[in-house]
């Protein structure tokens, strides 16, 4: 699809029912540079997605032995290659490997498939049991009801469909059964973790629901016996509950989490929202991105006539509209707290009892790349207007500024390592920035930085989160975005051929 900018200027004023209102000058800024050299075989090679995938393959040879040290592929919170680490069946590995799977489907390069399969085969035994480490330990998932441990299950279905090896389906069926055991709050939402009772986090929608929807499609397609209706309805119920309880209608965006506890207490958090506060008060970009992608990927599997499908498509449109609105026009990226700009910081750090001023906000790479993937895929699938290709292109240009490629070396800058639910704006932006692969220890506690931190967000000297290079969420997000934005030569949005584009 080619966008003619003069024609676009003419039709935009007549668009009805969209919040994508674009001034002529803004259109020119967004659409003037198609940046087709990456997607259409231009001079600026190598492509970003392939470079990141090759970097992982070459840096971590993915040896079988759990004592492989720096050669292990375990990107769990970016602890390698600085220290030995076991392989984890965990989203921090599943996300970059799923991004690599997308690059495999885009390029047909078998080494990516072999790498992913080898990683999975060190964790799946002959009976389809999932092992925690790569040395055949019988220890199961660290807790099978933690949704973060379920995300790699999407790869199990992909590998089964590619190889027909029943081990992968057996392992997937075990995770499918585990989903039935996740505890629920009184309203019916899955607990994010047992340590966070009654809390549904947006993150969890991406971690488990696309897998369950894909598994339900296996039922529906008669590939395996089972109840597709229950699987699909479970998925849409979780998405709708998040929509019901975290949606901010003014901003068309979603808060990080909500709490269904009868006593209103947010348990397990270092800096929780106020007791009785049903939702968090912060619009964290990556949690919104997880929700956005979770819904988009679920739509791949959900039947066209499912009664909840239109509501899910509406969620995708709402978020897409907000992404246009809150995109940083200077960089093309999105901020860590998506709706806050540095010229309009919240008073008192976003909390009435805050003792320090609000800290600056900053662009976050992984969320930005996930948004690009979601926008581009939604355009391709027809969920949103083709005009959003402009937003996706600007976002992709911004993401590429955060990817440093020097020969075989790759650095993806500016990704937050992890983010618990917090009660204040400051708790989401009070970051320790380092340009290395390791997380490193938290700053030592001081009198003004207690352990655990105080109920309100801590003073500026107490960093609550880390921003690093080559964090796994960032590596995976960039490959996902590249799988949509870096097509084979001559292809445009909506004209992908030869590979499975789900």
Residue ranges and their predicted role:
Residues 125-271:
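Extended ligand-binding groove/face enriched in aromatic
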Residues 215-233, 298-310, 378-386:
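Inter-helical turn/loop segments and adjacent helix faces that build the functional surface
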Residues 41-94, 106-147, 151-153, 159-162, ...:
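CBM-like carbohydrate-recognition segments
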Residues 55, 102, 122, 174-181, ...:
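Alpha-helical scaffold segments in carbohydrate-active enzymes
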């Amino acid at each position: 699809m080619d966008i003619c900018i003069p024609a676009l200027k003419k039709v935009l004023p007549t668009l009805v029912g969209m919040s994508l209102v674009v001034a002529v000058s803004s259109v020119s800024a967004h659409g003037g540079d198609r940046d087709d050299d990456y997607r259409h075989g231009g001079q600026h090679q190598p492509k970003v997605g392939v470079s990141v995938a090759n970097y992982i393959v070459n840096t971590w040879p993915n040896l079988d032995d759990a004592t492989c040290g720096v050669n292990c592929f375990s990107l769990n919170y970016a602890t390698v290659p600085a220290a030995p680490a076991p392989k984890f069946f965990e989203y921090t590995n599943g996300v970059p490997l799923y991004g690599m799977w997308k690059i495999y489907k885009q390029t047909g390069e078998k080494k990516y498939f072999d790498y992913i399969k080898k990683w999975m085969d060190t964790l799946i035994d002959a009976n389809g049991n999932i092992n925690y480490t790569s040395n055949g330990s019988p220890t199961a998932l660290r807790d099978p009801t933690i949704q973060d441990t379920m995300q790699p299950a999407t790869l199990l279905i992909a590998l089964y469909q590619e190889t027909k090896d029943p081990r992968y389906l057996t392992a997937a069926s075990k995770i499918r059964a585990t989903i039935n055991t996740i505890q629920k709050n009184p309203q019916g939402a899955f607990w994010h973790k047992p340590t966070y009772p009654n809390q549904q986090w947006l993150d969890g929608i991406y971690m488990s629901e696309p897998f369950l929807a894909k598994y339900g499609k296996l039922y529906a397609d008669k590939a395996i016996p089972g109840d597709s209706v229950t699987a699909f309805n479970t998925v849409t119920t979780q998405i709708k509950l998040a929509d019901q309880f975290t949606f901010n209608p003014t901003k068309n965006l979603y808060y990080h989490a909500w709490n269904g506890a009868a006593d209103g207490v947010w348990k397990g958090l270092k800096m929780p929202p106020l007791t009785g506060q049903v939702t968090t008060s912060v619009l964290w970009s990556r949690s919104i991105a997880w929700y956005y992608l979770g819904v988009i990927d679920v739509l791949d599997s959900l039947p066209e006539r499912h009664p909840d499908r239109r509501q899910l498509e509406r969620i995708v449109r709402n978020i897409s509209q907000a992404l246009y609105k809150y995109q940083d026009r200077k960089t093309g990226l999105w901020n860590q707290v998506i709706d806050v700009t540095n010229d309009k910081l919240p008073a008192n750090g976003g909390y009435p009892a805050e003792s320090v001023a609000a800290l600056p906000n900053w662009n976050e790479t992984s969320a930005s790349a996930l948004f690009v993937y979601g926008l581009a895929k939604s355009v391709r699938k027809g969920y949103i207007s083709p005009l959003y290709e402009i937003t996706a292109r600007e976002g992709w240009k911004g993401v590429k500024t955060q990817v440093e490629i020097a020969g075989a070396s790759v650095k993806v800058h500016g990704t937050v390592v992890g983010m618990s639910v917090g009660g204040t704006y400051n708790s989401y932006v009070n970051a320790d920035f380092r340009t290395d692969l390791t997380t490193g220890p938290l700053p030592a506690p001081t009198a003004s930085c207690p352990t655990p931190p105080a109920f309100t967000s801590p003073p500026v000297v107490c960093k609550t989160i880390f921003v690093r290079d080559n964090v796994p969420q960032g590596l995976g997000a960039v490959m996902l975005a590249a799988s949509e934005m870096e097509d084979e030569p001559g292809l445009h949005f909506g004209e992908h051929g030869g590979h499975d584009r789900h």
